[in-house]
């Protein structure tokens, strides 16, 4: 049984850090005197505004470049950074729209000085938005370059493994190995440099100390020392509690530079004397969630109980201190603008100031140059136009009597419009028809030109003279350039969306031209050559920022050309082409990626090209029968339309080599003909040869999607013969009478594995290859050996598990035994094949297959040269050659196909269980359950290794394979009946069900019809650790191994098979009665339910009655749970079950678990309940709060602390956004 004391050691990425957003400890007036912690500010006069010169930057040495790249961590930080930049853009766009609305609303009764200030802020925000978009595009380019280097490094790693297999070989082989090793090292260094470059673009974290908060913990006169460590950056501060309840700290503010791989360590020490210092607590906090546009008030639990909290205000700036834009604080100027607005709107216009007089003179000169007429300064003529200038219609109409004011004194302006540009604009004006707003043409100059004699203003002025089109009101970053603007627009800033980004084809720079990643494959290939040939010289140039004169003239709103339209350097310009796909097989998030179209200005979902891999293997269209199989040498399937492959087709085995044909949406599907029992499908559709390599980063799930929880494996996409007939017989399943699998919805990203040829996307981070294999295993079905000489599924499954265990080494001590047994199994298999130990774990990777890791370079070039329909079909000779190569190489095998299939199933099961490890937060029952199952699998591999000398012998009974530690009559006999006439190693679930019903159906049907089937299903689900489908699924069914049967029976308390069947039948009947719609049946079952019969399913049924039952039933369930929880055995069993329910995917199940924990008054559930109160949905939060109040004094204290902390925080930091705003 699993014990609650088992707390596995955590790795650093998932260190136990409470993500509590609470600011608990804000004491009320009734707690320990009149102390008030509502404001944490030192006594005396209020603080001055933030001055950057006063802020201490706690870093003297730059963070060193990493030695080993960490792509997984970079993916997480990049995703959080993009989310923060997008939020920054949205906030400033909203502020800009607000100011523009304010300008329109305040034109009639306001003086021009107020409009001047508003328009100045609008222009400042526009410049900041352009700079922010350029910064985001630079980050996208760095990340795309990093993805290319990562794929090249994975390919070089495959080459090294390929050359390292077997003996050293010839001198040429050794030289090739040295070259591949050198390339791997160079790619690694390039990745490290790119990580360092990207780290330099993360901006700054401005931290402000808010104070300590504690529930009955802080006293007057207490002194504390807080030490924060962030990489090489330090911040140490001391503070004391004053008698007034305020806290005084010697340092209040600091600036931290964000780091990619480091965590913020906080240590709080209470100073009590000269040497008596007490460490209150020390925690490590995640910082990737601090990339947010708005200031965040975060609270960190310093100790385990959460009685001491550190409150910090964190402000993230996307730019460094030395590179701060002038408009970074424009969002905070709304109060000043509102004050001016209220002042100016109460009185008539006053005498113009000198600045306004200069503005009037400039407008008068402009008017005289254009038509020689004068314009009035009267408020009656301003109306609601955007400038005092009258439209052409108004000028030619009958003049009205206007009140003329005396001409102000001439005042020299800081700069004037050049004569040439002015004349040019006058020449172009008659050819254009400006849009009219309330009968007036908007004036081309802005009010901000009066006081801003900068290069930025001059460039904008020149741009407006060249192209005097009417600006689009309001910022609109989601605009693509049309075909007429491609040639004359120097740069198009990227489109920022949630998870989608498009880099600019060319960017104007004044320095060396940086290398950019372009969506077109040719530019990607160009980047690869540049980064590999001159990495030290080219990589730093990627981060060169342009001066304000270069990028400030780029107008995303107006799409106007700038003065720097000619790119200095070797930057290339690519015309966007419609319907351009960036890869043969898109990632999970690539299916919604839109490409620029020359005829549209906005991205449209209908212009998205989704290329799906339609892999069809004929043996999957079969209904396997363990008794009768019919060989089918040929099988033809005609697909009328190109549909998304189902899970049984799309997930390719790590060792299956299938030729995949790509189709565009709506294309007619090909005719697929299989001419061999070995499932290799030939397709006349245009395709490229893609080989799936298990150790490369080819197969992956989308980063935005979680891997499948592995409730049950999907159908295998390859031939699944029944190896239990004989250890040396190889038969193919009959395909006659099968039905084609229906394709699921196209929005199922988990079912589309990523091809090695897909280009890296800036919006889709790629996990590392070890996580790729695990995620692919979670989706892939458990394969079963066909017994061929070229069958490499065993070694591929072994290599996948070994790679996964490498990632978890040292993090979970429980996995040490499993790793030893898997390594022992690999050694025994190698010895059987006569291989040396120096050979790598994945022996199937040859040099030819390793070279295909670089196939994405050629594929991208082919995509750029040929259209979607110009691909050449792969020849049948190539297909046959690949199949021949795969069958000629040596493969690991025990000599018995059934045992091979059994080992493959257990290896993949271990890989799926590893996905459940490393969870964050206090909900760890699934993790503990997975560790327990992994310990069982270690015993299985130990048993297999101990009987390695008997691998070649054909076992005929279960007695020859396994032995129980205690006498358990009936179990092995039952297994022999299930595998009668077959191998005893593996059996189908359907056969076990038929055997069980035939043996126990007559006896159990006397009590209730269908009870035997329900008992057997429960037995199989408990043994397999997953739910079985209630309806028959197409394709081969689930398999059940003798070792799964043996390890499950070993953990049972039942002495015999008959006793187990009787106990399980009683439990099944109890669960059915508890789930009955008849209230009398439910109450009777509750009254007669014995303590020993209430196990997991019964406890779940009881907890569900707390949600779905009426008041009488709920009261009876509560009473029953309280009385039964007095027993220690039942209480531990119930506690584990209800805690496990808190991690269920169903909301009602989590609500039931919360209410049940409150009924048994479990203090062990306080921490998980508090976590749910902060992170889950409203229904679960309400149930968790109700349960906390029932968990005694400690639970009520936690509930009060939670409520106070939530009330003290702003509404934007409520429970619904906890995960994104807390540490």
Swiss-Prot record:
Gene3D superfamilies: Leucine-rich Repeat Variant. The modification Phosphoserine is found at residues 22, 345, 347, 451, 454, 468, 748, 874-875. One of its GO terms (biological process) is positive regulation of intracellular protein transport. Residues 858-867 have a biased composition (Acidic residues). GO terms for cellular component: cytoplasm; cytosol; Golgi apparatus; membrane. This is Rho family-interacting cell polarization regulator 1. One of its GO terms (molecular function) is 14-3-3 protein binding. Keywords: Coiled coil, Cytoplasm, Golgi apparatus, Phosphoprotein. Residues 868-885 have a biased composition (Basic and acidic residues). It comes from Mus musculus.
């Amino acid at each position: 049984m699993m014990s609650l004391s088992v707390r596995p050691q955590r790795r650093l990425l998932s260190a136990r850090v409470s993500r509590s957003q609470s600011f608990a400890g804000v004491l009320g007036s009734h707690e320990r005197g009149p102390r008030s912690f509502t404001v944490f500010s030192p006594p005396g006069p209020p603080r001055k505004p933030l001055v950057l010169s006063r802020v201490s930057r706690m870093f003297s040495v730059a963070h060193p470049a990493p030695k080993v790249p960490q792509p997984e961590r970079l993916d997480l930080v990049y995703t959080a950074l993009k989310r923060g930049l997008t939020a920054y853009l949205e906030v400033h766009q909203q502020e800009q729209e607000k100011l523009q609305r304010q300008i329109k609303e305040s034109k009639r009764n306001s003086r021009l000085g107020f409009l001047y200030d508003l328009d100045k802020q609008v222009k400042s925000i526009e410049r900041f938005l352009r700079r922010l978009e350029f910064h985001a595009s630079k980050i996208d380019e760095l990340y795309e370059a990093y993805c290319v280097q990562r794929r090249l490094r994975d390919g070089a790693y495959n080459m090294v493994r390929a050359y390292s297999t077997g003996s050293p070989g010839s001198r040429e082989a050794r030289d090739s190995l040295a070259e591949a090793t050198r390339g791997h090292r160079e790619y690694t260094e390039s990745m490290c440099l790119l990580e360092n470059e990207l780290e330099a673009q993360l901006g700054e974290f401005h931290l402000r100390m808010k104070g300590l908060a504690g529930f009955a913990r802080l006293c007057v006169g207490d002194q504390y020392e807080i030490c924060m460590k962030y990489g090489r950056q330090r911040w140490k501060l001391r503070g004391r509690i004053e008698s007034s309840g305020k806290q005084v700290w010697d340092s209040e503010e600091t600036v931290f530079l964000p780091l990619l791989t480091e965590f913020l360590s906080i240590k709080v020490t209470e100073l009590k004397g000269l040497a008596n210092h007490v460490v209150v607590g020390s925690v490590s906090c995640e910082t990737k969630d601090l990339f947010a546009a708005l200031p965040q008030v975060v609270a960190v639990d310093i100790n385990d109980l959460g009685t001491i909290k550190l409150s910090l205000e964190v402000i993230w700036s996307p730019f460094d201190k030395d590179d701060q834009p002038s408009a970074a604080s424009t969002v905070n100027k709304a109060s000043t603008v509102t004050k001016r607005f209220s002042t100016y709107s109460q009185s008539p216009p006053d005498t113009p100031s000198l600045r306004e007089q200069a503005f009037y003179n400039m407008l008068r000169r402009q008017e005289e140059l254009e038509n020689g007429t004068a314009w009035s300064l009267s408020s009656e003529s301003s109306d609601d136009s955007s400038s005092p200038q009258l439209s052409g219609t108004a000028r030619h109409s009958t003049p009205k009597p206007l009140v003329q004011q005396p001409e102000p004194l001439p005042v020299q302006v800081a700069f004037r419009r050049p004569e040439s540009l002015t004349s040019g604009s006058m020449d172009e004006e008659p050819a254009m028809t400006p849009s009219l707003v309330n009968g007036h043409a908007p004036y081309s100059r802005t009010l901000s030109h009066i006081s801003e004699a900068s290069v930025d203003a001059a460039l904008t002025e020149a741009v407006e003279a060249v192209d005097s089109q009417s600006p689009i009101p309001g910022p609109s970053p989601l605009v693509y350039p049309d075909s007429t603007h491609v040639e004359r627009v120097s740069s198009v800033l990227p489109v920022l969306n949630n998870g989608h980004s498009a880099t600019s084809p060319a960017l104007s720079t004044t320095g060396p031209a940086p290398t950019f990643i372009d969506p077109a494959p040719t530019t990607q290939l160009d980047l690869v050559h540049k980064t590999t040939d001159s990495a030290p010289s080219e990589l730093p140039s990627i981060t060169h920022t342009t001066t304000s004169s270069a990028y400030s003239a780029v107008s995303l709103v107006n799409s106007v050309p700038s003065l720097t339209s000619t790119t200095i350097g070797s930057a290339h310009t690519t015309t966007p082409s419609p319907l351009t796909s960036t890869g043969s097989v898109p990632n999970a998030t690539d299916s919604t990626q839109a490409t620029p179209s020359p005829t549209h200005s906005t991205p449209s979902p209908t212009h998205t090209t989704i290329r799906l891999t339609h892999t069809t293997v004929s043996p999957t269209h079969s209904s396997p029968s363990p008794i009768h199989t019919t060989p089918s040498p040929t099988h033809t399937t005609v697909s009328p339309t190109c549909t998304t492959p189902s899970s049984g087709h799309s997930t390719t085995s790590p060792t299956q080599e299938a030729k995949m044909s790509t189709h565009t949406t709506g294309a007619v599907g090909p005719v697929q003909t299989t001419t061999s029992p070995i499932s290799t499908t030939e397709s006349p559709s245009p395709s490229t040869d893609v080989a799936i390599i298990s150790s490369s980063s080819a197969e992956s799930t989308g980063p935005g999607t979680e891997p499948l929880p592995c409730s049950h494996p999907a159908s295998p996409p390859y031939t699944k013969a029944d190896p239990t007939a004989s250890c040396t017989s190889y038969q193919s399943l009959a395909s006659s009478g099968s039905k084609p699998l229906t394709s699921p919805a196209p929005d199922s990203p988990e079912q589309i594995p990523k091809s090695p040829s897909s280009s890296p996307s800036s919006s889709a981070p790629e996990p590392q290859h070890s996580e790729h294999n695990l995620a692919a295993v979670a989706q892939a079905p458990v394969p079963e050996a066909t017994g061929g000489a070229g069958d490499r599924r065993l070694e591929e499954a072994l290599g996948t598990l070994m790679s996964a265990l490498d990632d978890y080494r040292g993090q979970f001590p429980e996995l040490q035994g499993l790793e030893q047994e898997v390594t022992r199994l690999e050694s025994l298999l190698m010895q059987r094949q006569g291989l040396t130990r120096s050979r790598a774990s994945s022996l199937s990777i040859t040099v030819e297959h390793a070279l295909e890791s670089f196939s994405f370079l050629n594929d991208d070039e082919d995509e750029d040269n040929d259209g979607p329909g110009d691909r050449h079909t792969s020849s049948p000779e190539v297909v046959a050659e690949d199949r021949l190569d795969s069958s000629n190489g040596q493969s690991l095998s025990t000599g018995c196909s059934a045992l091979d299939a059994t080992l493959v199933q257990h290896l993949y099961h271990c890989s799926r269980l590893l996905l459940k490890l490393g969870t964050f937060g206090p909900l760890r029952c699934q993790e503990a359950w997975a560790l327990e199952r992994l310990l069982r699998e270690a015993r299985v591999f130990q048993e297999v290794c101990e009987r390695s000398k008997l691998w070649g012998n054909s076992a005929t009974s279960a007695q020859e394979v396994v032995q129980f530690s205690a006498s358990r009559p009936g179990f092995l006999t039952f297994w022999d009946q299930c595998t009668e006439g077959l191998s005893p190693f593996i059996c189908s679930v359907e056969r076990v069900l038929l055997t069980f019903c035939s043996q126990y159906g007559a006896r159990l049907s006397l009590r209730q019809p269908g009870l035997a089937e329900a008992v057997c299903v429960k037995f199989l689900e408990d043994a397999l650790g997953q739910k079985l489908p209630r309806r028959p699924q197409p394709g081969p069914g689930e398999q059940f191994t003798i070792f799964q049967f043996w390890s499950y029976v070993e953990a049972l308390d039942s002495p015999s098979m008959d006793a187990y069947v009787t106990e399980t039948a009683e439990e099944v009947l109890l669960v059915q009665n508890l789930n009955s719609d008849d209230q009398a049946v439910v109450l009777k079952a509750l009254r007669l339910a014995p303590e020993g019969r209430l196990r997991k399913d019964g406890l779940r049924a009881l907890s569900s009655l707390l949600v779905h039952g009426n008041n009488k039933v709920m009261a009876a369930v509560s009473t029953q749970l309280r009385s039964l929880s007095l027993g220690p055995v039942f209480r531990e069993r119930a506690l584990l079950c209800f805690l496990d329910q808190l991690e269920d995917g169903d909301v009602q199940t989590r609500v039931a678990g919360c209410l049940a924990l409150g009924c048994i008054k479990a203090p062990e559930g306080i921490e998980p309940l508090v976590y749910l109160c902060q992170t889950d949905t409203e229904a679960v939060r309400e149930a968790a709060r109700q349960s906390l109040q029932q968990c005694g004094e400690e639970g009520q204290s936690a509930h009060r602390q939670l409520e106070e902390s939530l009330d003290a925080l702003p509404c934007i930091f409520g429970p619904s956004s906890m995960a994104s705003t807390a540490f």
